Structures are given as C-alpha cells and as structure tokens.
A protein has these predicted regions:
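Active-site-adjacent segment of FAD-dependent monooxygenases/related oxidoreductases
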Residues: 1
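Conserved beta-loop-beta/alpha segment of the NTase-like Rossmann-fold superfamily
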Residues: 4, 11-93
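Short secondary-structure junctions
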Residues: 8-10, 98
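Catalytic-core segments of class I nucleotidyltransferases/pyrophosphorylases
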Residues: 62-66, 97-165, 169-181
C-alpha cells in the first residue's frame, strides 16, 4: 500500500503536495489523481489530508481495509451538532458497511464523523476521473469517498484513539502540552 499525505514529510512513499514532485492542482481530489498519474501508482492507497497528530497506529486501519477488501474510511463518534455540520457524517450497518455518507449535513442522519483518512483500493482509485465527470467535488478530500460510497461497497473503521487537528497556534500549543506529559 502506498501513502499519500498532504502534510510535509520525508518518508520514501509519502507524496506531500508541496514536495516538488508535481505542481498541486489546488484541489484535493485532483491532487490525488495527479499524484497517481505522475508517480504511476497502481497500488492501494492510504490517503491522509490535513495537519493531524494521532495517538494510535494506522496499521490496524490498513489491516481492516485489506480484510474487508473494500475502500474504507476512518470514523469517530461526534455528538455535537455544530461539529457534525462541518464534516462528513456516515451511518453503518452491523458489519461496518457504510449505509449513508453526507458532507456537512444540516440535519445529520447519524453521529459518526469522517476525518480525512482513507484507504482506497487500486481499482477504486482508477475511478477518480469517472467521479469528477459525474458530480464529485474537486476540492474537499472527502468528496471522492462520498461519491464512491454510492457506487461501491465501502466500510468504516472506528478510530481506536484520539486525533488532534492542528488548525491554529492554540491547537498546536495544546497538542504540544498533551504529548509532552
């Protein structure tokens, strides 16, 4: 599995949008497509967007995706309506299969929020152009997952720990204090 990340990194198989490997399209879904084309990627992909710090390993998420043999998203419980309205919300059946996927819903059907962490099967990555031609948004990284969930079975892995979104200096300072203990 290859890893695509929008945050700067130095790993061998990580392709940040500011890496100089390609000029970003300034639209997350198009950036994924561009990286796949420029790097000639034909493998399953782990895609992550945003400035996040996790207190858990991603290895179980990747294992889950391989076991389910579908593209997968990660999710966590979010019970605050205002936060639900600013993110993707999904519902699941008893086997973790996504039954609905809404981007920034005014009236959410569920309470499982989807951060920008996705495992895409290689066969699904090949469908990005089809998605873009059929109404998938170009910008938000979750647009492709939302579109794909209506085209093919997708599963969701419940986040086993905490995710810290570093959106400003205050959240950065908070995360520093959490991890320095």
């Amino acid at each position: 599995m290859k890893i695509l990340s929008a945050a700067p990194n130095t790993g061998n198989n990580i392709c940040p949008t500011n890496s100089g490997i390609f000029k970003p399209a300034k639209a997350a879904v198009k950036d994924i497509q561009l990286a796949v084309e420029k790097l000639n990627l034909a493998d399953d992909l782990l895609v992550m967007a945003g400035d996040n710090v996790l207190d858990f390993s991603l290895s179980k998420f990747v294992k889950f995706a391989k076991e389910k043999n579908t593209s997968c998203v990660m999710c966590h419980e979010e019970n605050e309506l205002k936060k639900q309205q600013k993110t993707a919300i999904i519902t699941l059946d008893g086997n973790d299969l996504i039954t609905s996927y809404e981007e920034k819903p005014k009236e959410p059907k569920g309470n499982l929020a989807v951060p920008p962490f996705y495992c895409y099967r290689a066969c699904d990555v090949k469908r990005i152009q089809e998605a873009l031609e059929n109404g998938c948004g170009y910008d938000a990284p979750g647009s492709f997952a939302a579109w794909l969930s209506k085209q093919a079975p997708m599963h969701a892995y419940v986040m086993p720990g905490k995710r810290y979104d570093i959106g400003d200096i205050n959240s950065y300072e908070y995360v520093k204090s959490v991890f320095s203990k």
